[in-house]
Amino acid sequence: MQEILIPLKEKSYKVFLGELPEIKLKQKALIISDSIVAGLHLPYLLERLNALEVRVCVIESGEKYKNFHSLERILNNAFEMQLNRHSLMIALGGGVISDMVGFASSIYFRGIDFINIPTTLLAQVDASVGGKTGINTPYGKNLIGSFHQPKAVYMDLAFLKTLEKREFQAGVAEIIKMAVCFDKNLVERLETKDLKDCLEEVIFQSVNIKAQVVVQDEKERNIRAGLNYGHTFGMLIENETNYERFLHGEAIAIGMRMANDLALSLGMLTLKEYERIENLLKKFDLIFNYQITDIQKFYERLFLDKKSENQTLKFILPKGVGAFEIASHIPKETILKVLEKWH
């Protein structure tokens, strides 16, 4: 089993990559999963979990259920089970479950521990590590949330065998995001290797990238913003399509292409670099059609992005391959010209 230590000032924890070990707990544990994952993987977890008392809360599967109602269900289960400050929650699922359980545990009794057991590629390489938690609102994605680090993260590649191809590819989008912004060697590996032959190494490399970024910038003051490449556009697209048309990684792939259009127009990417990223997305079937129906409305809604300050939009844009820049004060006309390409 491989381990990655994430040494933060207030709370350090480990990410374990390998077969799920026996988890022995001296306290009560509330497991939260979704309706699909629970049927596939809950028995596997229960075989390996030894706790004072265990209860399971199952939420409907899908991004549209990452809301106040589901959060309330989790908290009600915690109260009914009489969890205390020494108890913990366990997130068994993808990014939706990881985000919600992290948030629920951060506000229950002003904060209790939780363990992440991510079952999708996207959650393993991104959502389960770093402490970002939250729920969606009609106004946008993850607009209500907190920073709350897990007690531990357990990644078992066996979970990925049950993923549909579409779900798997959505996770690859997040790997590409990190590679383009932080590691050109990972870009080269994705370009030249068959991912099936090096999946564990790529996951380990991706988690290492995120771990190093989080250690440097836990609360996203500067370098961690690079992990939001594609998200300014992508998360708005998710909201505009009611979280039904695209998976998160698919929307982020569209968002990365929009960001690349903007970077190209600003001279931050050469045409060769632009085409290189485009071809990498094509290799993993991450090219999707999307049409903006109302350009002005879409532009105005960009200001709900959490990175915006003083009515100034900020975009994470690739600066070549393997680096990024936080770009602001971009002329409105330049942004609108990019949006027109998608109209």
Swiss-Prot record:
Parts forming coiled coils: none
Keywords of the record: Amino-acid biosynthesis, Aromatic amino acid biosynthesis, Cobalt, Cytoplasm, Lyase, Metal-binding, NAD, Nucleotide-binding, Zinc
EC number, as in UniProt: 4.2.3.4
Enzyme superclass (EC): lyase
Binding positions (NAD(+)): 61-66, 95-99, 119-120, 132, 141, 159-162
HAMAP family on file: DHQ_synthase (MF_00110)
The protein's name in its UniProt record: 3-dehydroquinate synthase
Organism for this UniProt entry: Helicobacter pylori (strain J99 / ATCC 700824)
Organismal lineage: Bacteria, Pseudomonadati, Campylobacterota, Epsilonproteobacteria, Campylobacterales
